[in-house]
Amino acid sequence: MRCRREFIKIFGSAAVLSSARIATPLFTGSESDQGNALRARLASDPLRPQYHLLPAKNWMNDPNGPIYWKGFYHMFFQYNPGAAVWGDMHWAHAVSPDMIHWRHLPLALAPSPDGADADGCFTGSAVDDHGTATIIYTGVKTSAPEEATLRDGVHTFREVQCLATSSDVELRTWAKCKQPILQPPNDPRLTGFRDPFLWREGNIWYLGIGAGFRKEGGCVLLYRSRDLRQWQYLHPLATGKWTGHESVNPVDSGEMWECPDFFPLGTKHVLLYSTAGSVIWEVGELDSKELIFHVQKRGILDHGAYYAQKTQLDSHGNRILWGWIPEKRPEAEFSAAGWAGCVSLPRLLSIGVDGDLEMRVASVANSLRAKTFVLPQHHVAVSERGSTLKAIHFDNVCGELAWKTKAAASTFKLEDRAGTWWSLHCELQGSTTKLNVNGVSVDSPATSKAEREFHLFLDASVAELICDRKHAITTRIYRKPDGPLRLVLDDSNLAQITSLQAWQLRAISSDRLTS
């Protein structure tokens, strides 16, 4: 799996560094005819998602600072206003009444030419500081190699933590503190210092930052403060292990943790982070006196095209997970397309009876359902390829499928006239079930449950699958279906299906969020 730093290394030299100012719209009123033509082309691009959040154009990556504020959900995300490749990181901004239906607002944060964030406003978090909306984010600026904390073979960035506040209801305008609120440790072994997250206990704020040390491993550095501006370093909240392999990018070798997040869930605490090609979840206990996290269970958050995880509380106090769905096609293709990346659907997190982290797409996504397809099991035609259920035509490939099966081994395909478009193959191997989704292979321990549960969301080139609320596999499909999609199952599996439902889903805008 390609990590975020690899995107920086590959695309950084091609990035367009602009001097865009805060509150610049994604499309400006002075745009040329060429720009209007781009908007029209993006609005009709069959590979561009229709109900996932994404910018009007160009590149996006990490979701940043999701927050429920004054009755609305605000999502910020890493954005390049100048091109559909990584570079010149700003904070784009969108707002929603329900975490599903989004509209774009002006850019929230832009690099300050003479500031500590001159080369980018990187990932961060948003919190309510006694009635004041406050963002803490990582600012980066090119520096001498000996002062840099991010070294990827292309850049030598010094990473510091910066703060900005907003006083308007829609969080349209932000005022930055003139100076960084936190400098990195003076340690030559440091592999990074970015992606802050926060929580509060009483009058004390705690700040965690993704970091690591060469030939030791990634970690979360823990700080505390009473005012979000003066910080005291405590110790690592959690630490990992180096893989033992040398790498130019310390994320690849487990020597750096990106995008950490930490929060209570039920009676446990959960730590999320990305390192060594995986997005990791850990469930355990927080020692409230020593402020050290002790891991009890560990797993993979999503096995596919998913990175830069971020959580928030919804209006009911539920823990909601977001992630960046990156492109899986060559740079030349998505650069020419004029857009890259989107935000995942909101996933509701919980702790299972076995102590594992569980997830499902939040029920607010039900508002997308426009039509229910009737799929009785007797509507089956036997073919050489297996049992074919009644064909489903998802307009613009906006659809949802949910099914349950008693079969330990099974195959579930979506086919068009050209062949297999999306497939899931489950094979029992001893005490393990091997799941294969469009070439992505996942090992799933055998379950004592009488049936397995699958939930699939299709949106143009995006497919989000969750199995048994434990295994998420997000994939990209860069081929428009040739005609209606047919559901194809093994003959032996058909009788084992206990439930099968399908819905046509609505687009959340008339122009694929290009305005």
What are these regions (language model features)?
Residues 122, 194, 258, 307, ...:
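Short beta-strand or tight-loop elements
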Residues 1-2:
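Secretory targeting signals
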Residues 26-195, 200-252, 257-259, 264-303, ...:
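Beta-rich carbohydrate-recognition and catalytic domains
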Residues 6-28:
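N-terminal export signals
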Residues 287-291, 296-304, 312-515:
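Beta-rich accessory regions
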